């Protein structure tokens, strides 16, 4: 993997990631394909509206269907028929979300499979080995997702464990002679000194890119923005900056303005299935009775398949009846909206007009929910 920084507009960055499998223009948004599938979408549909890279989850794939099943096809790309790059999450977040069913030690985490209750152990080495077998183009280190809220002593202890695991992840990645990219993950909760310490240690270890973890875990928007105000500048300018698990369209705009290059989030797909649709003027809750006889299109500014062919009334009907087509049409629109938003931001940075873009974006987003 190679990253080229092409242009900056204040702190906002316009770049390109070059993989053997193709190029990814940044800032970039990755739809989440947890089990090797972006829900309701074919790979061809994803590509058609600008998706360049997707995210898979090594924890879930290792349990279902199992790494042996994926390897029987070749790798994860072959298994799901996706021709572009794939980033895989290490599984750290998922393991720690199991709560009382898992036990953390210096070596790693013991837990029971959410599938059948079987005992499983996962540490940095196991996670890196799984991601190598999946053929991930970007491998993530295994870390502890710091709980929120937590006192500073707890956050510090968690961060130090993650840093030791980061070194072990790097050592295993090198031992396997994996030529694909490996990203570190900055932790440290809401504490600036700990975040800066985490970033500095990861830079010293040496990674191909750096992710910011431990955000969008329950903190306020103000707390998240405060971290983004100082943290990106602590990371090397020639390396990718990835904000994990974020977020709303407004979150993406704020983060790009502060120097973030990559994002992933389940929001556009999950919200689509629940009838929350992102538009140029705000969120449309398509189940609302007001749309029963509304024959207008969802978003007059959108050129997606859904907006070119169907009315709000029809989408309302599909959502009320829980029709599979409704989930598909909603997902097509939300993902198209996200990818078009990223395209607009890339163009704004290229033309040194990001501030103008941001002002117009907020002027249009006049309502949170319609």
Swiss-Prot record:
Q: What is this protein called?
A: Queuine tRNA-ribosyltransferase
**Cofactor(s) named in the record:** Zn(2+)
GO CC annotation, single: cytosol
Active-site residues (renumbered): 89 (proton acceptor), 264 (nucleophile)
Q: Where is this region: RNA binding?
A: 245-251, 269-273
Q: How is the cofactor bound?
A: Binds 1 zinc ion per subunit.
Q: Write out the function statement from the record.
A: Catalyzes the base-exchange of a guanine (G) residue with the queuine precursor 7-aminomethyl-7-deazaguanine (PreQ1) at position 34 (anticodon wobble position) in tRNAs with GU(N) anticodons (tRNA-Asp, -Asn, -His and -Tyr). Catalysis occurs through a double-displacement mechanism. The nucleophile active site attacks the C1' of nucleotide 34 to detach the guanine base from the RNA, forming a covalent enzyme-RNA intermediate. The proton acceptor active site deprotonates the incoming PreQ1, allowing a nucleophilic attack on the C1' of the ribose to form the product.
As recorded in Swiss-Prot or TrEMBL, the protein's gene is named tgt
Family of this protein: Belongs to the queuine tRNA-ribosyltransferase family.
Q: Which residues form a coiled coil?
A: none
What does the record give as EC number? 2.4.2.29
InterPro entries the UniProt entry points to: ArchSynthase1/Queuine_TRR, TGT, TGT-like_sf, tRNA_ribo_trans-like
Assembly notes: Homodimer. Within each dimer, one monomer is responsible for RNA recognition and catalysis, while the other monomer binds to the replacement base PreQ1.
Q: Which GO terms describe its biological process?
A: queuosine biosynthetic process; tRNA wobble guanine modification; tRNA-guanine transglycosylation
State if Amino-acid biosynthesis is listed as a keyword: no
Reactions catalysed, semicolon-separated, are: 7-aminomethyl-7-carbaguanine + guanosine(34) in tRNA = 7-aminomethyl-7-carbaguanosine(34) in tRNA + guanine
Q: Which SUPFAM superfamilies match?
A: tRNA-guanine transglycosylase
Pfam family of the protein (one): TGT
Q: Does the keyword Acetylation apply?
A: no
Give me the disulphide-bonded residues. none
Q: Which GO terms fall under molecular function for this chain's record?
A: metal ion binding; tRNA-guanosine(34) queuine transglycosylase activity
Q: Which domain of life is it from?
A: Bacteria
